Design a protein with these regions (language model features):
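Solvent-exposed, non-transmembrane regions of membrane-associated and secreted proteins
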Residues: 11-265
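N-terminal Lys/Arg-rich, disordered targeting/topogenic segments
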Residues: 1-16, 290
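C-terminal single-pass membrane-anchor helix
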Residues: 255-290
């Protein structure tokens, strides 16, 4: 009988240790996965931060660094900046629009992708509607700020941007903001004929959430910035601007990037590591006591 009791006691102890071990493994696995997800999220947003590309940005008296970027990737054709927003990125173009959905401007795989000109557009911006795509991301990354223009107060305060191409800075005067279906063929095809251009002008007039009193003619060169929106099924936010010979220097603030957000995420990672260490210490102590 004593032998049977001892066997039962040993079995219970082994089972108890086994349950503790399984629980520890599950907790550590979940915490490790959470830590990895935070780290991976950091990597995506770090690559999407406009500050990463600032050293390559062409300036009035210096474009050498931009040419160096073009040597790294000859798909780089220009630079887009929307004043007083976080949109301040190199611009790329290739024969396949899908490529830069998940490729950065240096040609590396990246979930944040790049800001890219529609493959069917002329890289010298001689078309009537020049369509530029970018991911809508949180933390104001990539084209995340396009959605801000659907707020009338924001739209009213943000009029200008700049587009650098062919070695020259050109101004952009933003005219309208629209929300359209992604499958709207008129909106996302390059207009060639005069009829198509007139139809595009009507599209803007009839679908703008907000529009400035600026005339558009078929002889203009429009810059169409488009990105996803969750406000409607298959929705796209479409910011319409017009190229001008006048440039518009930014007057207020520079892009501050995502340093604070990254710091917060790194703090979370440190807390996870501390908790893992504490859990292991408690488990070891419990085993010793037993």
């Amino acid at each position: 009988m004593d032998k049977l009791k001892k066997m039962i006691k040993n079995f219970i102890q082994i089972t108890d240790h086994l349950v503790d071990l399984i629980a520890l493994i599950l907790i550590l696995s979940m915490m490790s996965l959470s830590g990895y997800m935070l780290w991976d999220s950091n990597q995506v947003y770090e690559k999407a931060d406009a500050k990463v590309y600032e050293p390559y940005m062409p300036t009035r008296n210096h474009s050498k660094s931009f040419k160096e970027l073009q040597q790294i990737n000859n798909d780089v054709i220009g630079w887009l900046k929307v004043n007083n927003t976080h949109i301040n990125y190199p611009l790329v173009q290739c024969e396949n629009d899908d490529k830069y959905m998940n490729t950065d401007v240096e040609g590396n795989y990246s979930l944040s992708g790049s800001i890219f000109l529609h493959a069917e557009n002329n890289p010298h911006f001689t078309d009537f509607n020049n369509i530029i795509y970018g991911h809508h991301m949180e933390k104001h990354m990539m084209f995340g700020d396009i959605g801000e223009f659907t707020n009338q107060n924001f739209f009213n305060k943000h009029h200008y941007g700049n587009l650098y191409y062919d070695g020259i800075n050109h101004g952009i005067e933003f005219i309208a903001i629209m929300q359209l279906d992604a499958y709207n063929e008129r909106a996302f095809n390059v207009c060639i004929s005069e009829e198509a251009k007139q139809e595009y002008i009507k599209l803007i007039d009839n679908n703008s959430l907000y529009k400035r009193n600026v005339q558009i003619s078929p002889n203009d060169h429009l810059v169409i910035l488009t990105t996803c929106t969750s406000d409607m099924t298959n929705g796209r936010n479409v910011l319409v601007g017009k190229l001008t010979n006048k440039t518009y220097p930014e007057k207020i603030k520079k892009n501050k990037g995502i340093g604070i957000d990254i710091l917060n995420n790194n703090t979370y990672l440190e807390l996870i590591l501390i908790l893992i260490a504490l859990i292991i210490a408690v488990f070891v102590k419990k085993r010793k006591n037993n």
